[in-house]
A protein has these predicted regions:
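Bacterial N-terminal signal peptides that target proteins for export
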Residues: 1-12
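Hydrophobic alpha-helical targeting segments used for export or membrane insertion
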Residues: 10-22
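Conserved RNA-binding domains used in RNP assembly and mRNA/RNA metabolism
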Residues: 21-133
Length: 133
C-alpha cells in the first residue's frame, strides 16, 4: 500500500503558491497605490561609526527611474545642498569609503521613522569630489 501524504516542504509550497495567486488576483484590475516609491536625494556622504549618512541633503523626491542617466547626474550636480539627513542602508556594494566627503546623488527606498529617515540604496553616484555649500 502506497503512502499518498505530502512532504511538509511540498505542502508549504502549495500554500505559498495559493497565497501568491490570491494576492495576484486581488491586485488585478486596480493599480496599487501602496508601493514604496524610489526616491532621490543629493547631499554629502559622511560616516558615523559604521553608519553611512547623507548630510546636508535635499528633500527626498520621487525618482522617475531606478537608475541614474547622465542627464539626471548633470541636473543633480547643479542642485544646491539642503538641510535633510538620511542614514544609508545597503551601501557595502558601492564601496562608500572611496566617496567620504563627496557630493553624492543617492536613489533608493525611503524609510521614514520617528527619530530618523533612512534610504535603502539602489543607486550611488558621485557628483563632485568636494561637498561645499
Amino acid at each position: 500500500m502506497r503512502n499518498h501524504s505530502l512532504k511538509p516542504s511540498t505542502a508549504f509550497g502549495f500554500v505559498v503558491l495559493a497565497a501568491a495567486g490570491s494576492v495576484y488576483a486581488q491586485g488585478r484590475g486596480s493599480a496599487r497605490t501602496d508601493q514604496t516609491p524610489i526616491v532621490e536625494a543629493v547631499g554629502c556622504l559622511s560616516q558615523t561609526g559604521s553608519n553611512w549618512i547623507l548630510t546636508d541633503a535635499t528633500e527626498a523626491a520621487t525618482a522617475t527611474t531606478t537608475f541614474t542617466t547622465p542627464e539626471a547626474l548633470k541636473a543633480a550636480a547643479e542642485k544646491p545642498l539642503g538641510t535633510q539627513q538620511y542614514r544609508l542602508l545597503g551601501t557595502s556594494p558601492f564601496s562608500p569609503d572611496r566617496h567620504k566627503g563627496h557630493k553624492m546623488a543617492i536613489k533608493g527606498l525611503l524609510i521614514k521613522g520617528d527619530s530618523e529617515s533612512r534610504i535603502n540604496v539602489t543607486s550611488f553616484q558621485m557628483l563632485a569630489e568636494t561637498c561645499a555649500k
